């Protein structure tokens, strides 16, 4: 099987574009997609000699949910063991370190203290961060939100 047949079986490269992480994909004021993901997909389509169709999703969980539906051929997502059941991942192109934000008066001083009863952590549902926390934490509660902005809103309200 050739790279074109494998990556673009319909004759065009259908790229799942995740707007949930502005580091990779975002829209400008006129609604045009910009970012590293866009640049990479455009270059890949060019090298394959096929057209590019960008299939846009608001959140990474939506991209992952469509992985087995034949809607997209390639996407940039966090590598996560739950997703690996239905998605074939290449080696990571980058690594993003994440941390916790706590209120100024919090008694939590290290990441080791976070996994405790009574601790609530807001994270976007089905995002790589939330999937990791779900598998790693045993005692803290995860508040799954619609998106990153909702997580910040919950943090600010509590």
Model-found features: residue ranges?
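Ligand-binding cleft/hinge of the Venus flytrap
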Residues: 25-29, 41-51, 91, 115, ...
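Solvent-exposed loop/turn segments at secondary-structure junctions
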Residues: 21-22, 60-61, 80-84, 106-108, ...
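Ligand-binding "clamshell"
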Residues: 82-96
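Short helix-initiation/N-cap motifs at beta->coil->alpha
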Residues: 53-65, 108-109, 143-157
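Short loop->beta-strand "edge-of-pocket" segments that line small-molecule binding or catalytic clefts
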Residues: 12-19, 34, 112-129, 140-142
